[in-house]
Amino acid sequence: MAQITTTDANEFSSSAEFIPMRGFSNCHLQTMLPRLFRRQVKFTPYWQRLELPDGDFVDLAWSEDPAQARHKPRLVVFHGLEGSLNSPYAHGLVEAAQKRGWLGVVMHFRGCSGEPNRMHRIYHSGETEDASWFLRWLQREFGHAPTAAVGYSLGGNMLACLLAKEGNDLPVDAAVIVSAPFMLEACSYHMEKGFSRVYQRYLLNLLKANAARKLAAYPGTLPINLAQLKSVRRIREFDDLITARIHGYADAIDYYRQCSAMTMLNRIAKPTLIIHAKDDPFMDHQVIPKPESLPPQVEYQLTEHGGHVGFIGGTLLHPQMWLESRIPDWLTTYLEAKSC
């Protein structure tokens, strides 16, 4: 597997250095270990269904009842492909936010909370409307409070697109983007090579299972039938037959090219931290932005190790989830200073 490399890596910030767990720096171990160390949600989530203007819904998993915590700084999490609160990175970060006295929430993309969504659409890497609507609803419903958004993988690319599209109008004070596939087409091809095919097969099975549940619950809400769905063998094929078609793109390549955040990064106006690992097995080297393409309010951190949304440090007996400290530490300036 080829590592992500760039001749410009030294020009980026590398504050808060990530040191991988001794003996476990391998990218695949880093990618898979979080599921061993973060198996269960350690807090009792407060669930809320948010009805959307088009008749669909998204489910919210809060760290506590938001009506009783409207004064607290807010941390919003956007998960990755087929992720949810149960994803180790999601509930781990919400728990970390809770420990700091912040209000944390995971906004599940349509159909990702365990119940199929109703409408003739799903979610994708460039679908920013739901996130935008939710962030504005959050402010209307609970009033003004310092707010940060964090996006992982697919959710990270989506968040980058949202930040670029809305600039200073987006009601967040800062953002963090982790392991985002900023060049969707290149990453799609990368997932079809070498050991990365194992991850593609895993994710594709999740996508197909979710789509099958949607077809069973709401027949006709996807542009293919169950027999066609079963024959899909690659994520690119899934995107070609379903994601692109249902959202008005010509095909998967058209979807990838229109929704890749790379060309939009220079339009991000809010303070933003972007984190990638050089050895991310999901990524192609093309996800690395050129230093001159980033505005001064965007900090880029490229680590030697970490895998895909892994970043496990410490020891086997005392593992340290680096993102659960790095992200809140970086956001403190924007969340706690404004709440004083």
PLM feature segments, named:
Residues 4-10, 140-246:
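Alpha/beta-hydrolase-fold enzymes
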Residues 24-70, 312-318:
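N-terminal cap/lid segment of alpha/beta-hydrolase-fold proteins
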Residues 71-80:
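Short beta-strand element of the alpha/beta-hydrolase
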Residues 83-95, 285-287:
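The serine-hydrolase catalytic nucleophile loop
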Residues 86, 94-118:
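Conserved alpha/beta-hydrolase
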Residues 110-148:
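Catalytic nucleophile-loop/oxyanion-hole region of alpha/beta-hydrolase
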Residues 268, 274-276, 280:
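Short beta-strand/loop motif that positions the catalytic acidic residue
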Residues 304-340:
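Catalytic active-site module of serine/aspartate enzymes centered on a nucleophile-bearing elbow/loop
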